[in-house]
Amino acid sequence: MTFGEKLLNAASTRGRLCVGIDPHESLLTSWGLPVNVDGLAEFSRACVEAFADTVALVKPQVAFYERFGSAGFAILEETIQTLRERGCLVVSDAKRGDIGSTMAGYASAWLDPASPLSSDAVTVSPYLGFHSLDPVFELAEQHGRGVFVLAATSNPEARELQDQQNADGVSISQQIVDQAAALNAPYMAQGKAGNIGVVIGATLSKPPRLSTLGGAILMPGVGAQGGTASDVDEIAGDMAHLAFPNVSRSILATGPDIAEMKNSVAKTAADFPGFPRS
């Protein structure tokens, strides 16, 4: 089964919501936790308890674990494994991008079932060339895992690069979406969602066209950054059933109380229902 189909199945019962686990320093402090490995572990375990049984897709931000070295990665491994064991899909927000054997190494780290960091999906950067990512696409195809390619991100600095156009007037972000769509096309022809998704900001005024993508759309910018459910639907259009807004700040702000975080998830997810699956 493709990652896209797994995600649609999860959304049918849990809604189309992606919740981030972002244990940055100020959030650890606001939770009353020490800014060290112990605080990281406690934060992560609370998030697992709040999200594992309620959210379709959870997105740990790898950088906040990586900063603590091997001990941080050990906590990330535990977090990913526990979430997946409890039926939650996990996208590791690693934003990896390289070429050749190095990209193959990143692909194995995040998508190979034998890896201790094995996740359902990973975020990647295409700016060494879209097909520099072929090793991760190939491993995703082999194991039914997902890849989210940065296409049109929500940070304002991105516009000067991602909105640039080629000689035919096609923006870089649109070219990325179109190349992802080409990889998903065989599945879309069968009425299925493919393995290759894109990252599209929910606050963009001129987003790329997504009507032929045929894969999942990860949409940061909802909630604290100002994006709304109507923004998600307008940008995603015919692909709205595959649009998964990423909400982190507003939900994590209700922690460390697990019940409060669960309530926040439920309220937010109500704006992004899934669709029944036959």
UniProtKB/Swiss-Prot annotation:
SUPFAM superfamilies: Ribulose-phoshate binding barrel. Pathway: Pyrimidine metabolism; UMP biosynthesis via de novo pathway; UMP from orotate: step 2/2. The active site is at K95. It comes from the Bacteria. Its EC number is 4.1.1.23. It is an enzyme of class 4 (lyase). One of its GO terms (molecular function) is orotidine-5'-phosphate decarboxylase activity. The keyword Cell membrane does not apply. One of its GO terms (biological process) is 'de novo' pyrimidine nucleobase biosynthetic process. It catalyses: orotidine 5'-phosphate + H(+) = UMP + CO2. Keywords: Decarboxylase, Lyase, Pyrimidine biosynthesis. Belongs to the OMP decarboxylase family. Type 2 subfamily. This is Orotidine 5'-phosphate decarboxylase. It comes from Corynebacterium glutamicum (strain R). The lineage of its organism: Bacteria, Bacillati, Actinomycetota, Actinomycetes, Mycobacteriales. The gene is pyrF.
